[in-house]
Amino acid sequence: MRDKIKKKLNELRENSLFRVMPEISEGAGKYISVEINKGFGKTEVRKYINMASNNYLGLSEIQEIKRASADAVLELGTTSGASRIVTGNYNLYDELERVTAEFKQTEASLVFNSGYAANVAVFSALADRNTAVFSDKLNHASIIDGILLSGAKHIRYRHNDIDDLAALLEKHKDEKDKIIATDTIFSMDGDVCRLRAIVELAEAYGAMTIVDEAHASGIFGRGRGYAHEAGLEKRVDIHMGTFSKAFGSFGAYVAADRDIIDYLRNKGRSFIYSTSLPPAVVAANLAALKYVKNHHDIGYRLLDAADDIRRQLQVMGFDTGDSVTQIIPVILGTNERVLMAKEFLMEKGIYVGAIRPPTVPVNTARLRMTVRLDVLDETERILDAFRTLKAAGI
């Protein structure tokens, strides 16, 4: 077994796929601090403009949100102490779920420890070997893992290909229980799903629709998500979203009708068998949610800025795929090239993610740039760095 592990690790290194943790001292804010090894036992801490974090609205630095989190620690301590169904529940949790359901305009909601835990619970609880789940090929790994754990028939349709989805639904039309699952914003491409067509097919074939709004929550639809932006929120059965991205905190929610939420509370293993979130996190989630409700225009400001940056990158000759959101891929192709580009941009003071297979398909390695509301005053510096990258021919 150890020889097998060593062989696999060597293969990762040879293919520029070996991953290590960056020496980051602070990584959520406007600037990211990274410890650089200078050799001979010497290190240097450098500061970069943070274009890699999912803290899209910069809410982690909003004083009223930080104060709410700190107050909860002082009042309730640092841990919940148990799972929700034992003693890990408290009033802040109940308020967060009530406010979340009101915000999402659903009957009820349930808070989970992470988006991964939420998707694993949803699919493993609702689907079984008699269920057919139709899933976009670029859906997040948590959706895929939830489907696999459920034992359901996992039927993947080509990314955003409605004709392929329709053909597969027709082929499997006799399946009694059917689910269509999709991200609304795809995390590595920054494009959006064809939700109206998906909903119409789901209704025609009697399928349940589940959407993952992780990268749309807080931004689209006055912060409510892409389904609300498209005016389809009442035609979607289950909405999942996170507090760990635009809301600047941690954890996730599922919003749906009361029966579905009651069922997940009783059958969602990742919910039942996890210690609940600590008071500091729940209070931050609640404060962030209220902040977005009161500042619902900030998502549109972010999208307008991202649109301007994307158009300028395209003018330079960069391939940004089908992005129409705050996530902008710069597709370079090979693993080696994308790693070189990342290092080049770091020399210019810009930190972006270098995304390689298996996260993205082979030969589509890319820089993943996430536009953030709190870095817009640095836009020209960012664009100048990309102009220099293009001129360098990397």
Language-model segments: what does each one mean?
Residues 205-208, 215, 219-324:
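Active-site C-terminal subdomain of aminotransferase-like
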Residues 300-307, 314-349, 363-364, 371-373:
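Conserved PLP-binding catalytic core of the aspartate aminotransferase-like
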Residues 122-141:
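Conserved PLP-anchoring active-site segment centered on the Schiff-base-forming lysine
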Residues 2, 6, 13-76, 207:
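N-terminal "arm"/small-domain region of PLP-dependent enzymes with the aminotransferase-like
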Residues 55, 155, 159-211:
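Active-site phosphate-binding strand-loop segment of PLP-dependent enzymes
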Residues 63, 67-71, 75, 98, ...:
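PLP-dependent enzyme catalytic core of the Aspartate aminotransferase-like
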Residues 66-114, 306:
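Conserved N-terminal alpha-helix of the aminotransferase class I/II PLP-enzyme fold
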